[in-house]
Structure formats: structure tokens, C-alpha cells
């Protein structure tokens, strides 16, 4: 499955991420970053930017987030959204969904 990164960040912080985690970033098909979009989670515009970038119906997108308010916002846009609690819980959710 293609991965996308949706992040509230700024140029300074993201420069650090690029410099120190480039090997991780290469796994993402696209990066939807708040400072580039001009909108932050939980605002509608950043989720709309994600939907445009992915190009799939919202229900076909699995959004994983550790902030409950952002999960709720994603769901208002029709995304399938899970709260991230722990790696073990996430693996269990993926297994139940047939994705692991």
C-alpha cells in the first residue's frame, strides 16, 4: 500500500527531519505538510489537500494518528481513521483488518 505523510510542521523542523530521517521519508509517496498547504490539522483544507494528492475515495484511505481530535476531523472527511495507541495495538488492528 502506498504511504503518505500528513504533518503539522514548519520549515525549520522539517529541515531537521529531512536531514536526520531521509531513509524513513523515502517510503512515502508524497508529503502533505502544513506549512506548504497553508493549513493545519484539524482544519478541513489540509485533509482536502490529502484527498487531492491520494486521488482515492476517502473511505479507501486509512489514516493513522495519535491525536483523537485529528482522528475525529479525518472521519468528518470520510476517511477511515484509527487512533494510534501502541505498536502492538496497531498490529492487532491491521491483523483484524486483514492487512498484516
Say what each PLM segment does.
Residues 9-12, 37-38, 68-69:
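Short, solvent-exposed loop/turn segments at secondary-structure junctions
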Residues 58-94:
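Acidic, Mg2+-coordinating phosphoryl-transfer loop and its flanking beta/alpha structural elements
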Residues 40-68:
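Conserved Lys-Pro-Asp/Glu-containing loop-to-beta segment of HAD-superfamily phosphomonoesterases
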Residues 26-30, 58-61:
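Short acidic capping loops at alpha-helix termini that bridge into adjacent secondary structure
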Amino acid at each position: 500500500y502506498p504511504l503518505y505523510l500528513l504533518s503539522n510542521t514548519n520549515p525549520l523542523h522539517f529541515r531537521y527531519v529531512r536531514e536526520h530521517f531521509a531513509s524513513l521519508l523515502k517510503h512515502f509517496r508524497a508529503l502533505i505538510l502544513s506549512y506548504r498547504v497553508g493549513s493545519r490539522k484539524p482544519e478541513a483544507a489540509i485533509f482536502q489537500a490529502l484527498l487531492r494528492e491520494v486521488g482515492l475515495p476517502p473511505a479507501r484511505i486509512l489514516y493513522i494518528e495519535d491525536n483523537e481530535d485529528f482522528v475525529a476531523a479525518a472521519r468528518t472527511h470520510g476517511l477511515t481513521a484509527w487512533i494510534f495507541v501502541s505498536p502492538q495495538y496497531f498490529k492487532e488492528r491491521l491483523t483484524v483488518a486483514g492487512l498484516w
